[in-house]
Amino acid sequence: MPNPLTPQYPGIAVVELFTSEGCSSCPSADATLARVAERAERAGRNIFPVELHVDYWDYLGWRDPFDDARYSERQATYRALSGSTYTPQAVVNGVSDCVGSNEARLSSLIEAELAKPATTQLQLSARFSAAGVQAHYQIDASEPAQTLALIVVEARRESAVLRGENAGERLAHRNVARAFATRPLASGHGAGDWELALPAGFVRDGARVLAFAERAHGGITGAALVGIAPG
């Protein structure tokens, strides 16, 4: 039962899809995430889907242009949820997971998390800078010992796959993580600035910044998503 003295905010659902262009099972999950994103945006719900492309399938012959070893490392922290590491894996608020193409199960997990009050309130703004993206955050949390994560997200990308399991396919992506960083929060209250570099070829149109706070032992407690203003 929630502590009545703990500040509570509207529920949120951060959906991390661990995916790869080198995995033949992943395109259907990418399409599922795109539908989740579109429905959430139309309804104005606190659902924050993001694709994180892992690098461990590159050996199959196709190097995913959006992959990053940090996303593979992050997925490894979720191994306890299912007992294995696989793609496509969808993780909701860091506490539950399912096969990313299982839309009914994913929707059920999302609704379960939205029904829970968030315990961290995040306010966020972002603008393009000479070095990449500069973000300003303000946090009000009931739990002080947390980590703040920041992800710069491209709205839409497409890729023509030439080799590997998806050779010959043209894959479409929504909400693709392109820059990622974390920092510890000593206090549950405060504000700060953050600058992240962007990769070559970054598409600015529709890009956004996602921030979320998470407990050291797992579980996302609050999140915010904003567009990026011109520099």
Segments (PLM) and residue ranges:
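N-terminal cysteine/histidine-rich coordination modules
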Residues: 2-6, 29
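Extracytoplasmic
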Residues: 10-12, 44, 87, 145
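Short active-site neighborhood of thiol/selenol oxidoreductases, capturing the structured segment around
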Residues: 9-24, 50
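Solvent-exposed loop/turn segments at secondary-structure junctions
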Residues: 20-24, 32, 54-59, 96-99
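Short, conserved sequence motifs used for protein processing/export or organelle targeting and
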Residues: 63-87, 91-231
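Typically the conserved alpha-helix immediately C-terminal to a functionally engaged Cys/Sec
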Residues: 25-41
